[in-house]
From Swiss-Prot:
It comes from Listeria monocytogenes serovar 1/2a (strain ATCC BAA-679 / EGD-e). Residues 2-88 form the Core-binding (CB) domain. The active site is at R150, K174, H246, R249, H272, Y281 (o-(3'-phospho-dna)-tyrosine intermediate). It is found in: Cytoplasm. HAMAP family: Recomb_XerC_XerD. GO terms for biological process: cell division; chromosome segregation; DNA recombination; DNA transposition. Site-specific tyrosine recombinase, which acts by catalyzing the cutting and rejoining of the recombining DNA molecules. The XerC-XerD complex is essential to convert dimers of the bacterial chromosome into monomers to permit their segregation at cell division. It also contributes to the segregational stability of plasmids. It comes from the Bacteria. GO terms for molecular function: DNA binding; site-specific recombinase activity; tyrosine-based site-specific recombinase activity. The gene is xerC. This is Tyrosine recombinase XerC. GO terms for cellular component: cytoplasm. Forms a cyclic heterotetrameric complex composed of two molecules of XerC and two molecules of XerD. The lineage of its organism: Bacteria, Bacillati, Bacillota, Bacilli, Bacillales.
Length: 300
């Protein structure tokens, strides 16, 4: 049975001291957490770490059956998402089970992904010339799309992490969990072309480190720097809809499932602690199939 303890108190202290929430708002959060804890105890779930996306769906169904207003449900979702975001920040959990639950409609918030023509436009940008930073961006795009790793994980890749004989990269994920992810021929060729230019750039600025990706001064490329580079690539590709770099990870998972990969393998490649975090992509692939049908079938 889950009882109120140190985690909850730390969260409430965080709301008061760092978020400056009012007493009324904090009380609402406490009540929402109390109600969720009651539900977990009824489900024989003994720790917050055990909660999965499917448990969240069951809880939302229960709220709907109790005829809570949409506003109340949205507030409860917001409270619990904030609590789990706090647990994630404190390294208590590896995945936030509330990530893909929508505030407004109490529905899944499906991950967005790139369509094939959009991916082609992105790759055209990084293959337009062989300048040093273009070669770097080519590695960036080929590795992110080819492995599905997070932007933060990409920033942490060191040269010793590359195993070119097996075409695999050692990745340090959330909670410092390590996993090997394979990469394909395109990524291998991009890395091979880039490494000599990386050496030249670092020598020019007298830099010495093992980071795979570097900026224009030869320093390690940070997570923020990677996001900036990707934003520039997206801008050059003239893609019109609202796009964010994490969509490359979503596209990796969606493309694998669309082409017959099994769920467990995709889970392992993504570094998801829970299979429920990966199951969200089955909804994406169904939506993709439906949208493709509606777009291309003459009788749709």
């Amino acid at each position: 049975m889950i009882q109120e303890g140190k985690l909850e108190q730390q969260f409430f202290d965080y709301l008061h001291s760092e978020r400056n929430y009012s007493v009324n708002t904090s009380t609402a959060y406490e009540n929402d957490l109390l109600d969720f804890r009651r539900f977990l105890n009824e489900q024989a779930i003994t720790t917050y770490q055990q909660v999965t996306f499917l448990d969240v769906r069951i809880y939302l169904t229960e709220l709907k059956q109790k005829s809570f207003s949409r506003t109340t449900v949205a507030r409860k979702i917001s409270s619990l998402r904030s609590f789990y975001t706090f647990l994630l920040r404190e390294n208590v959990i590896n995945e936030n089970p509330f990530t893909y639950v929508s505030h407004a409609k109490n529905q899944l918030r499906l991950p967005k992904f790139f369509y094939s023509e959009e991916m082609e436009a992105l790759f055209q940008v990084v293959y337009e010339d062989n300048e040093t930073l273009t070669l770097r961006d080519r590695v960036l795009l080929e590795v992110l799309y080819g492995t599905g790793i997070r932007v933060s994980e990409c920033a942490g890749i060191l040269l010793p992490d590359l195993d070119t004989s097996y075409q695999a990269i050692l990745i340090r994920g959330k909670g410092n969990k390590e996993r090997y992810v394979p990469f394909g021929a395109y990524a291998e060729d991009a890395i091979t072309d880039y490494l000599p230019e990386r050496v030249n750039l670092m020598s020019r600025y007298k830099k010495s480190h093992d980071a795979l990706l570097v900026n224009h001064y030869g320093d390690p490329l940070t997570t923020r720097g990677i996001r900036y580079c990707l934003t520039k690539i997206i801008s050059k590709a003239s893609l019109t809809r609202k796009i964010h770099p994490h969509m490359l990870r979503h596209t990796f998972a969606t493309d694998l499932l669309n082409n017959g990969a099994d769920m467990r393998t995709v889970q392992e490649l993504l570094g998801h602690a829970s299979l429920s975090s990966t199951q969200i992509y089955t909804h994406v692939t169904k939506e993709h199939l439906k949208s493709t049908y509606m777009k291309h079938h003459p009788r749709a």
